[in-house]
Amino acid sequence: MEYTVNQLSPVKTQVTVSVPAEEANAALASAVAMFRSRTDLKGFRKGKVPSSVVEQRFKKEIVSEATTDLINVHINEIMGELKLSPLSGLDVSEAALTKGEPLEYTFSFEHAPAFDLPEYKGQAVEEEDVVVSEADIESVIERVRKNLAEVKPLSDNRPAKDGEIVSVTFEAFEDGKAIPGVRAENFELTLGEGQALPAFEELVKTIASGNEGEGDVTFPADFINTELAGRTVTMKVAVHVIKERTLPPVDDELAKKAGNFENLDKMREAITMSYKKSREDLHRSSAQKKLLDSLLATLDFPLPPAVVEQQLGQMVEEFVGQLERRGKSLESTGKTLADIQGEMRPRAEELVKTQIFLSAVALKEELTVTPQEMDAFFYRLSTQAGQDVIMLKRYYEDNGLMIMVRDKLLCDKAADLIYANALVTKVAPVEKPAGEEAQD
């Protein structure tokens, strides 16, 4: 076997392979022998069927298997010599071995471009320090109270107030005609928590339980559904039920219900530790991304198109899945698939560029991923997804996704290595707008 390499672009290579007749004959003979050993035909003992009969009976299957096996052997050998790792699937030309004849075929693949790594160790970066205030702790306790609150329907037919839960059916109209996609039945929301447009909530608060009402609502100019952005519509609303939330007192009993804590002080200690740890992780992640962004800004190299498209496809699929889980469709956003792809493409390109950079760092640092680290990844994933870890791992194996997982873990290790060798300066935390901390 001989081959020639043609660099189609900085990120794509084509290999042309020439197979002499002798090698083709050997591959076919090996396939015939394998088929002969497992063939069971009436009139012959198993494994004793004449080769000529086997060739005649299974000619198509023999040629297919011999060709596939030989090409796979060649590709593994060639890729090892080229020291290139495909970032996308290999595109192999059609080929079929013929007895006594040479064979030529090609395969192409996308890979990382060649580039010089910047100095990634000893880089300066600022990381926000963590300060846990009393207000932070109180906001968490307030969320605990809301989660453990007693909720019951109101008996009197009055309009709802902030903090109360309403169940409504609504529909939007314009010039007397219903607007498609702007309708919901038995929609439940808590007033005063920003779960709906302020104008819509104000309208709901004018309608008593069991009654209907209508009013004009103007959608903001930056509304997610671009077809509704900036438009004023007539919203017809029916309020079915109003529920009152009674918060439990802040005492030792609350602590026991919240997490079987011994008393309120123990719960506050646990909240403080958990809050501090989550903020430390958040600030570290933010600083790490800032450091990576600064390193990536010094690099300029082409990206493999197929890899970008694959990343973009995954992101769009995840976005559409999130919409569907919320009972919405892509059409409900007022955007086309092309619109979403256009908005997400820069992020997809950024992710691919980051992956290529971190993979190069991992290679230079000779980082590896152990089987135990792979198992730990699937354990965490199964816990998050609520799925059996063995079945989840088998799915990844059956769908050829294990290399993707390994590469992700390698990139994570490379990012951690860069940050571990950075010159980190702690700075005072940036003050956030009121209420934003409570959302973390």
UniProtKB/Swiss-Prot annotation:
HAMAP family in UniProt: Trigger_factor_Tig
GO terms assigned for molecular function: peptidyl-prolyl cis-trans isomerase activity
Main localisation: cytoplasm
SUPFAM superfamilies in alphabetical order: FKBP-like, Triger factor/SurA peptide-binding domain-like, Trigger factor ribosome-binding domain
One Pfam family in the UniProt entry: Trigger_C
Keyword annotations: Cell cycle, Cell division, Chaperone, Cytoplasm, Isomerase, Rotamase
Top-level class of the enzyme under EC nomenclature: isomerase
Lineage: Bacteria, Pseudomonadati, Thermodesulfobacteriota, Desulfovibrionia, Desulfovibrionales
EC code: 5.2.1.8
Record domain PPIase FKBP-type: where: 163-248
Any GO CC annotation of this UniProt entry: cytoplasm
Family: Belongs to the FKBP-type PPIase family. Tig subfamily.
Compartments where found: Cytoplasm
Transmembrane segment boundaries: none
Secretion signal span: none
Domain remarks in the Swiss-Prot or TrEMBL record: Consists of 3 domains; the N-terminus binds the ribosome, the middle domain has PPIase activity, while the C-terminus has intrinsic chaperone activity on its own.
GO annotation (BP), single: cell division
Protein name, per record: Trigger factor
Function: Involved in protein export. Acts as a chaperone by maintaining the newly synthesized protein in an open conformation. Functions as a peptidyl-prolyl cis-trans isomerase.
Encoding gene, per UniProt annotation: tig
Catalytic activity field: [protein]-peptidylproline (omega=180) = [protein]-peptidylproline (omega=0)
